[in-house]
UniProtKB/Swiss-Prot annotation:
<keyword id="KW-0324">Glycolysis</keyword>
<protein>
    <recommendedName>
        <fullName>Fructose-bisphosphate aldolase class 1</fullName>
        <ecNumber>4.1.2.13</ecNumber>
    </recommendedName>
</protein>
<dbReference type="Pfam" id="PF00274">
    <property type="entry name" value="Glycolytic"/>
</dbReference>
<comment type="pathway">
    <text>Carbohydrate degradation; glycolysis; D-glyceraldehyde 3-phosphate and glycerone phosphate from D-glucose: step 4/4.</text>
</comment>
<comment type="similarity">
    <text>Belongs to the class I fructose-bisphosphate aldolase family.</text>
</comment>
<dbReference type="GO" id="GO:0004332">
    <property type="term" value="F:fructose-bisphosphate aldolase activity"/>
</dbReference>
<dbReference type="InterPro" id="IPR023014">
    <property type="entry name" value="FBA_I_Gram+-type"/>
</dbReference>
<dbReference type="GO" id="GO:0006096">
    <property type="term" value="P:glycolytic process"/>
</dbReference>
<keyword id="KW-0704">Schiff base</keyword>
<feature type="active site" description="Proton acceptor">
    <location>
        <position position="175"/>
    </location>
</feature>
<keyword id="KW-0456">Lyase</keyword>
<dbReference type="InterPro" id="IPR000741">
    <property type="entry name" value="FBA_I"/>
</dbReference>
<dbReference type="InterPro" id="IPR013785">
    <property type="entry name" value="Aldolase_TIM"/>
</dbReference>
<feature type="active site" description="Schiff-base intermediate with dihydroxyacetone-P">
    <location>
        <position position="212"/>
    </location>
</feature>
Amino acid sequence: MNKEQLEKMKNGKGFIAALDQSGGSTPKALKEYGINEDQYSNEDEMFQLVHDMRTRVVTSPSFSPDKILGAILFEQTMDREVEGKYTADYLADKGVVPFLKVDKGLAEEQNGVQLMKPIDNLDSLLDRANERHIFGTKMRSNILELNEQGIKDVVEQQFEVAKQIIAKGLVPIIEPEVNINAKDKAEIEKVLKAELKKGLDSLNADQLVMLKLTIPTEANLYKDLAEHPNVVRIVVLSGGYSREKANELLKDNAELIASFSRALASDLRAGQSKEEFDKALGDAVESIYDASVNKN
């Protein structure tokens, strides 16, 4: 583990850019960027277009390591290059800590939750991540209803996989998303917090994790989890809120920083000039940084 990157993730001022839309969500991300499905004829072309978009983001002067602590990449992005370097090396050289999305998507809903599908190639994927100088990973589950068994299952699965990731020398981001429209969202979050605490308490002193959570209904609910000795940092997802709304809610949570995807890229368009693109990205970065650093 890179100690300098660990220090940056633990104490740095800023947020994490989530650039990890995978195959399933790529057409939607491209469409929002202004590229329709009739502009590519196969998956290779689609992934090339999305890599071009990500390259445009990470090479922009607005994508500044003074504001952006880390970036989460999709597996394809890890194996591609930006300006002649593998993406993770390009980011690390720029001062941005690289993470890799490792999950294979969500299973069918059961007990009010969606567990992760099995990650059958996890070992070899983590070996490749180490070869590509990746610092940490991210994997997402989804909680839709107040169901204690379901929430327990989500957290247990996350920690089980997290321990395999830690054993390979990487820092896992555990992401049990709570759907922002869930009927009993505040109650779900209390149950989730208790289960997360159990999981964290089961770790050895040298087993470090990060958490990526939905912004809680009750402000500062996760403050004591953020102070847990095994937690490097807690980041939050935008989860379907507009950027303005997500930023506003984030400002009420002292220890939390953003890890936004859609909310970061929502004003970026393929047809923008370099100046327009850099300004749109810069405005987004500035507002998300502000919500992550300057609290109410």
